[in-house]
Amino acid sequence: MTRAQSAADDARNAMVAGLLASGISVNGLQPSHNPQVAAKMFTTATKLDPAMCDAWLARLLAGDQTMDVLAGAWAAVRTFGWETRRLGVTDLQFRPEVSDGLFLRLAVTSVDSLACAYAAVLAENKRYQEASDLLDTTDPKHPFDAELVSYVRGVLYFRTKRWPDVLAQFPEATPWRHPELKAAGAAMATTALASLGVFEEAFRRAQEAIEGDRVPGAANIALYTQGMCLRHVGREEEAVELLRRVYSRDAKFSPAREALDNPNYRLVLTDPETIEARKDPWDPDSAPTRAQTEAARHAEMAAKYLAEGDAELNAMLGMEQAKKEIKLIKSTTKVNLARAKMGLPVPVTSRHTLLLGPPGTGKTSVARAFTKQLCGLTVLRKPLVVETSRTKLLGRYMADAEKNTEEMLEGSLGGAVFFDEMHTLHEKGYSQGDPYGNAIINTLLLYMENHRDELVVFGAGYAKAMEKMLEVNQGLRRRFSTVIEFFSYTPEELIALTKLMGQENEDVITEEEAQVLLPSYTRFYNDQNYSEDGDLIRGIDMLGNAGFVRNVVEKARDHRSFRLDDEDLDAVLNSDLTEFSELQMRRFRELTKEDLAEGLSAAVAEKKTN
């Protein structure tokens, strides 16, 4: 007999002695109950024959659930069950269990369940990647083992706070053969939902873990999470009641005690994006903070807004003075940001801007593009431009005007406000002044001054009318640091604008065809009147400048549609063709002189009717 054979026989004898000392009958021999002897014999067996997997499992049965024992069992997994089958020991007699460190004891009855038990202990010892790799090697054929693999993978994700992955392991609609696994999984899913801020769903899901109290530890976590969800939604009295219930069930459950002692104690909330941004997928502390994530997201959006604002401004026809002023403000803002970064003093300046000129000349478009630029430069938080006017802010009583203005401005913080026809804020005809206008202006002044670092106000209207309104309140005039003038579109610019608007939908308006509009555009431009305040108002201003041109083009398209409604159109619609030549499409893209002339006539008639 070789030394190896002798060691193997001695290991088998030690295994038998250990089983007998564990109360398990072998070969008809009477067992005893001596745990110390059993543990010693099983340890001897693994020393004599490390390849005997069942000897390692027997050490688990004897209570030796160290990492080394599980590692030894897994290293010898090729011989799983050999010795117990040789000795005629059944699974009911020989059933080692391993704690998952959280809720349950996992029975080791197969190779896959051994992998799960080992992975659970690896995860408990923060060897997360090894645990994940081990679970990846499993290919369970038995449905109970498949459930166990899912459960332990969920435990791994729960320990590492990978909440979306926890929810993926424990979908609500999935039936579980092991009710204990279902209850523990529900507790983990409850925590995941609450940590993602889905409080109502978390509160409801918790009932799966609480009902029946199958797994007390899981029920405690579910009750605790319910209490914290109630706290997050402002139902403090109910929250405290649940937290006390948890503490009465388990005084060692420290989160409940801490939450009771500190009313400001809250769950740590996160989101899937932050979890995915971790440098180490298993380490929650390697993720950027919510503030850092928000800053990165804001930086990404800022670049987008800056590019959009620049593109929109550059695409506008004419308005060279306006573009120059906006670029100057943008440059000043960038320099001030650089000075602040260098620790140099930066003057506190407002960016409130007066946009003076007739309607339809691009004031609103410039305000939107400028707001995007400021958002892109991180001066503003959002590219929101709230459009308002005196009419929108007035109420039945003077207090209504003040309240409406305050609510509008409060909702605009971080963005911009565009006051259309701002010169109408203060109206004439009141013997003691305009109380409604004063209420709006006084509220506006407070926000323009106190929130000038997070709010931009644009005031739009005619120049002389605006000047007279500002004379009523010099404080308001001083708040506007920039004045940009806009002018009526010239006949040539109106022609260029017509062609540009046609291109937006891939329509074709040639220079020759557009010239049919020039006499009318010239007449509208040269038609001059003066307002009561002394502002020059041209005929094209009354029509709406760019807005009028857009209406001309739209009406021209309507006429083209009517013109094209013939047999050829029906033939196109009824054919099976999916590709068309440039010549065929040109008929549907071209706006003719007739279309434009009819569009002009219809647009003028509509304006007169309105």
Curated annotation (Swiss-Prot):
Keyword Cytoplasm: yes
Alphabetized Gene3D superfamilies for the sequence: 1.10.8.60, P-loop containing nucleotide triphosphate hydrolases, Tetratricopeptide repeat domain
Molecular-function GO term, any one: ATP hydrolysis activity
Residues annotated as transmembrane: none
Chief location: cytoplasm
GO CC terms in record: cytoplasm
Location of this chain's protein in the cell: Cytoplasm
Disulfide bonds: none
UniProt binding sites for ATP: G357, P358, P359, G360, T361, G362, K363, T364
UniProt superkingdom: Bacteria
Any Pfam family the entry gives: T7SS_EccA1_N
Keyword tags: ATP-binding, Cytoplasm, Nucleotide-binding
UniProt-listed InterPro entries: AAA+_ATPase (IPR003593), ATPase_AAA_core (IPR003959), CbxX/CfxQ (IPR000641), CbxX/CfxQ_RuBisCO_ESX (IPR050773), P-loop_NTPase (IPR027417), T7SS_EccA (IPR023835), T7SS_EccA1-like_N (IPR049078), TPR-like_helical_dom_sf (IPR011990)
Family: Belongs to the CbxX/CfxQ family.
Subunit structure comment from the entry: Part of the ESX-5 / type VII secretion system (T7SS), which is composed of cytosolic and membrane components.
Function: Part of the ESX-5 specialized secretion system, which is responsible for the secretion of EsxN and a number of PE_PGRS and PPE proteins. EccA5 exhibits ATPase activity and may provide energy for the export of ESX-5 substrates.
Name the record gives this protein: ESX-5 secretion system protein EccA5
